[in-house]
Amino acid sequence: MVKVNLAPVPYSIEVPAEIAKHLSIENMITSTPSEFTNQAREAGAIAQVYINYKAADGTMHGFAGVYYFKKADFEKAQNPDEPPVYGSKVVEENSMVVAIAGPQDSIFDPNSQDGKNSATLYTLVYDPNSFKSS
C-alpha cells in the first residue's frame, strides 16, 4: 500500500501502488474555485480536494471530493431531508470530520483494469481505516 497525501486535508489515504500511480490530488480552492467551493467554505469546510483518476487511455476523471470540516459545522450543513451536500462522513477524529462525495457510478467497463481499479478505490475511500492523519 502507498500513502497518497490529501493536503491541504491533513490526511493521506492508503491505496495499492498500482492504483496510486493513476491518482492526482487537486485543491478545489486554488485550482478550480466555483460557487460550490465557495458555498462549502462558507459552510465551514477547512479544506476541499478532488481525487482525480487518470485512465489507461490518458483521460483524467474526477473520482471523488474530499471535505475537511469541524464536526459541528459539518453537522450544521446537513439537511435530513436531502442527500448530504458535502458527502458522507468517513473519518471523525478530534471533533473534525473527513467526508467523501462520489462517485455515484463507475464510468469504466467493470471488466477493464480501470473498472477494477475504480471499484477498489471506491471501497477504500469509504473505509475509515484507509485514512491516516498526517
Q: Can you name each region flagged by the protein language model?
A:
Residues A55-P83:
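Short, conserved beta-strand/beta-arch hydrophobic-aromatic motifs that form part
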